[in-house]
């Protein structure tokens, strides 16, 4: 793969909509990467955003930001795909499958043809299916194709638990797993606050009823619908989540993050990308942490996987998409 050097790290962003521009802004504010190229069919928008973001550099750190072409991906370390049809009010992420698969093929093919040899990071929805499709279309090793997965869902989960117990969200350790969507599920069995299991915390606080925990998860699961109904789209949260994942890659962190990753026997699943905690560094995914799930959680994982697999199989058959693997 591309040699990621500390003194020059390059990201190509494909998709300059609300999510893409929020991600580029997060990279700029946090000083992540030294070169960011933005690709979109609306070239004037990418040119405008490149100038606008560059105006912030005197307040952050040096960075080359520009309107790019697919050919610029040839020496990039990471290509981030946010392009796709947006989720409309009342529409599920899975409703987007056919149209976004068609869009994805027009993106992956020219990037691969450019000679790109880095890591694909996919955020377009439905992210688990489009990450799988990126892997199939690119012919890349599974370790170097990653989806944002349940990273945002897990962040929402931690935030809501933190608000319930009045602690910093960074001190809450909890995961949402499965599909980034309606069949996702909370891993309550391993959730903890500063090392104290949620189950133990609830025992010590009888005023907290089980119904409150159920409401927390439902709020997390339905958060996108709530935000979309209020303002039309979600972008700040996922933009920041993507910046965090990018930093873990470029800085070779070996960070554990909940991502959409390829299952090769883990949790009894195969040939599917789905949300699970995994170790990520400059080589991509180095290890999938197979958390010991309860019977109910494992059942939820398999239910989520079945739905994803059924949809992706049907979509590939109907669209007759040619793949590289």
From Swiss-Prot:
InterPro entries: L-lactate/malate_DH, L-lactate_DH, L-lactate_DH_AS, Lactate/malate_DH_C, Lactate/malate_DH_N, Lactate_DH/Glyco_Ohase_4_C, NAD(P)-bd_dom_sf. Beta-D-fructose 1,6-bisphosphate binds at residues 158, 173. The modification Phosphotyrosine is found at residue 225. Allosterically activated by fructose 1,6-bisphosphate (FBP). Its EC number is 1.1.1.27. SUPFAM superfamilies: LDH C-terminal domain-like (SSF56327), NAD(P)-binding Rossmann-fold domains (SSF51735). It comes from the Bacteria. It catalyses: (S)-lactate + NAD(+) = pyruvate + NADH + H(+). It is found in: Cytoplasm. GO terms for molecular function: L-lactate dehydrogenase activity. Pathway: Fermentation; pyruvate fermentation to lactate; (S)-lactate from pyruvate: step 1/1. Substrate binds at residues 87, 93, 125-128, 153-156, 234. The keyword Repressor does not apply. Keywords: Allosteric enzyme, Cytoplasm, NAD, Oxidoreductase, Phosphoprotein. Its main location: cytoplasm. GO terms for biological process: glycolytic process; lactate metabolic process. GO terms for cellular component: cytoplasm. Signal peptide: none annotated. The active site is at residue 180. The keyword Lipid biosynthesis does not apply. Catalyzes the conversion of lactate to pyruvate. Belongs to the LDH/MDH superfamily. LDH family. This is L-lactate dehydrogenase. It comes from Latilactobacillus sakei subsp. sakei (strain 23K). The gene is ldh.
């Amino acid at each position: 793969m591309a040699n990621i050097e500390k003194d020059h790290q390059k990201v190509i962003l494909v998709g300059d909509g609300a999510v893409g521009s929020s991600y580029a802004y997060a990279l700029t504010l946090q000083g992540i990467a030294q070169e960011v190229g933005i690709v979109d069919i609306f070239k004037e928008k990418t040119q405008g955003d490149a100038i606008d973001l560059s105006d912030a550099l005197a307040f952050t750190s040096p960075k080359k930001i520009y309107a790019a072409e697919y050919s610029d991906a040839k020496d990039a370390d990471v290509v981030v795909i946010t392009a796709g049809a947006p989720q409309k009010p009342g529409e599920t992420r899975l409703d987007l499958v056919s149209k976004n698969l068609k869009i994805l093929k027009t993106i992956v093919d020219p990037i691969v043809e450019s000679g790109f040899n880095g890591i694909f990071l996919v955020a377009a929805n439905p992210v688990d299916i489009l990450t799988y499709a990126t892997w199939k279309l690119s012919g890349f090793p599974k370790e170097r194709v990653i989806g944002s997965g349940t990273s945002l869902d897990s962040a929402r989960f931690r935030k809501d638990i933190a608000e319930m117990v009045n602690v910093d969200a960074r001190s809450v350790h909890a995961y949402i797993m499965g599909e980034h969507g309606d069949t996702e599920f909370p891993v309550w069995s391993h959730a903890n606050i500063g090392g104290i299991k949620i189950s133990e915390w609830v025992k010590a606080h009888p005023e907290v009823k089980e119904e409150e925990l159920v409401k927390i998860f439902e709020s997390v699961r339905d958060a996108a619908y709530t935000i979309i109904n209020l303002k039309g789209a979600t972008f700040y949260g996922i933009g920041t989540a993507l910046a965090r994942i990018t930093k873990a890659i470029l800085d070779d962190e070996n960070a554990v993050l909940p991502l959409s990753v390829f299952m090769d026997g883990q949790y009894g699943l195969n040939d599917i990308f789905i949300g699970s905690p995994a170790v990520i560094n400059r080589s991509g995914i180095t290890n999938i942490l197979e958390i010991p799930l309860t019977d109910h959680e494992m059942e939820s994982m398999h239910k989520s996987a079945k739905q994803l697999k059924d949809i992706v199989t049907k979509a590939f058959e109907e669209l007759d998409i040619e793949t590289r693997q």
